[in-house]
């Protein structure tokens, strides 16, 4: 029955997305909700200008429908269900607002950094409050051991850092056709298997709803992309994967399962610090680091496949660490 639920959750999210995206693309084109390409980005990306964005509206809707249906079918809706709903829906709503400002008000950068950060912090605090008053353990698991460290009130700081950090990390990674879609399929599949192994069916259902939605979206988002997810999708996926890692108490494994997100973010931080310290010199040709490889002559598809491969290796190792 449990396996049937997971397959059904995956299938419903996949089917809704596959049907919904082709119907949504003409609607976005009619409204002129097209992607703006930043002037400082790689020149080869200029041809992407005008590609419909905010496609995440479809797959987030599909995921939530599938997730909530099978959560209710499975019995009592748990606190974990609502925590995951908060992460996906509210981070998605923040991203939607950011996208809306970009495409409708023609402000290429969307929300200001301060506005986006305050929104992320507010959502993370709400997540912590629900988590705290639901009597979840406020501990961190030490990798490769059975030791858990009780953080007490410092746990709220960790929640803020983790949710805000990974929502931004996935957002930074979303710069190539299909990159984040494929990495999300890999990462949430890994966490879905871990949650199933731990008998946390609510979390497993959530993960496989996302896998189904993302595989459906990838059909249209792979190179050359017919539609982009926008910040609506990247912020929602980043916040969600951080939330899942907390609920299965495998927070540090996210650094391995989401290794590409970590590398992309680290490349930006290193570039900024080095640029300031050397007054204008750079480590990479351009960051996030996927642009470094593009400017080095790699095709977009080659970069994406390589990064997917690295993400897959990290995910397989992580699942083996937990199960074996």
From Swiss-Prot:
Which Gene Ontology terms cover its molecular function? metal ion binding; phospho-N-acetylmuramoyl-pentapeptide-transferase activity; UDP-N-acetylmuramoyl-L-alanyl-D-glutamyl-meso-2,6-diaminopimelyl-D-alanyl-D-alanine:undecaprenyl-phosphate transferase activity
The organism encoding this protein is Listeria welshimeri serovar 6b (strain ATCC 35897 / DSM 20650 / CCUG 15529 / CIP 8149 / NCTC 11857 / SLCC 5334 / V8)
Cellular component, GO annotation = plasma membrane
Q: What is its main location?
A: membrane
User: Membrane-crossing residues?
Assistant: 9-29, 54-74, 77-97, 117-137, 147-167, 176-196, 201-221, 227-247, 253-273, 304-324
Q: Reaction catalysed by this chain? A: UDP-N-acetyl-alpha-D-muramoyl-L-alanyl-gamma-D-glutamyl-meso-2,6-diaminopimeloyl-D-alanyl-D-alanine + di-trans,octa-cis-undecaprenyl phosphate = di-trans,octa-cis-undecaprenyl diphospho-N-acetyl-alpha-D-muramoyl-L-alanyl-D-glutamyl-meso-2,6-diaminopimeloyl-D-alanyl-D-alanine + UMP
Q: Which family does it belong to?
A: Belongs to the glycosyltransferase 4 family. MraY subfamily.
- Note the Pfam families from the entry: Glycos_transf_4
Associated pathway: Cell wall biogenesis; peptidoglycan biosynthesis
HAMAP family xref list: MraY
Record-given protein name: Phospho-N-acetylmuramoyl-pentapeptide-transferase
GO terms for biological process?
cell division; cell wall organization; peptidoglycan biosynthetic process; regulation of cell shape
What is the annotated role of this protein in its UniProt record? Catalyzes the initial step of the lipid cycle reactions in the biosynthesis of the cell wall peptidoglycan: transfers peptidoglycan precursor phospho-MurNAc-pentapeptide from UDP-MurNAc-pentapeptide onto the lipid carrier undecaprenyl phosphate, yielding undecaprenyl-pyrophosphoryl-MurNAc-pentapeptide, known as lipid I.
Q: In the UniProt record, what gene is named as encoding this protein?
A: mraY
Subcellular locations according to the entry: Cell membrane
EC number(s): the record gives 2.7.8.13
Q: Which cofactor does it need?
A: Mg(2+)
Write out the entry's keywords from A to Z.
Cell cycle, Cell division, Cell membrane, Cell shape, Cell wall biogenesis/degradation, Magnesium, Membrane, Metal-binding, Peptidoglycan synthesis, Transferase, Transmembrane, Transmembrane helix
- How does the record classify its membrane topology? Multi-pass membrane protein
């Amino acid at each position: 029955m449990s396996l049937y639920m997971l397959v059904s959750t995956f299938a419903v999210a996949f089917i809704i997305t596959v049907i919904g995206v082709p119907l949504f693309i003409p609607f976005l084109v009619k409204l002129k909700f097209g992607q703006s390409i930043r002037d400082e980005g790689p020149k080869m990306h200029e041809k992407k200008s005008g590609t419909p964005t905010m496609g995440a509206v479809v797959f987030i809707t599909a995921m939530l429908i599938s997730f909530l249906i099978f959560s209710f079918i499975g019995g009592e809706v748990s606190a974990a269900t609502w925590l995951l709903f908060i992460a996906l829906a509210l981070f998605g709503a923040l991203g939607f607002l950011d996208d809306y400002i970009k495409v409708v008000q023609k402000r290429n950068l969307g929300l200001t950094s301060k506005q986006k950060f305050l929104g992320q912090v507010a959502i993370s605090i709400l997540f912590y409050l629900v988590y705290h008053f639901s009597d979840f353990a406020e501990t961190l698991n030490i990798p490769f051991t059975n030791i858990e460290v009780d953080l007490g009130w410092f746990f709220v700081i960790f929640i803020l850092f983790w949710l805000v950090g990974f929502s931004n990390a996935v957002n930074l990674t979303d710069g190539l056709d299909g990159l984040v879609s494929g990495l999300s399929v890999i990462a949430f599949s890994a966490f879905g298997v871990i949650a199933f192994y731990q008998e946390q069916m609510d979390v497993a259902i959530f993960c496989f709803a996302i896998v189904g939605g993302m595989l459906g979206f990838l059909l249209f988002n792979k190179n050359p992309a017919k539609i982009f997810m926008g910040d609506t999708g990247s912020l929602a996926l980043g916040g969600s994967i951080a939330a899942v890692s907390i609920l299965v108490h495998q927070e540090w494994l996210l650094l391995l399962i989401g290794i590409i997100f970590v590398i992309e973010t680290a490349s930006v931080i290193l570039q900024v610090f080095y640029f300031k310290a050397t007054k204008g010199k750079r480590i990479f040709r351009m960051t996030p680091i996927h642009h470094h490889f593009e400017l080095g002559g790699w095709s977009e598809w080659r970069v994406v496949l390589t990064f997917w491969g690295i993400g897959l290796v990290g995910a397989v190792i992580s699942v083996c660490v937990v199960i074996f």
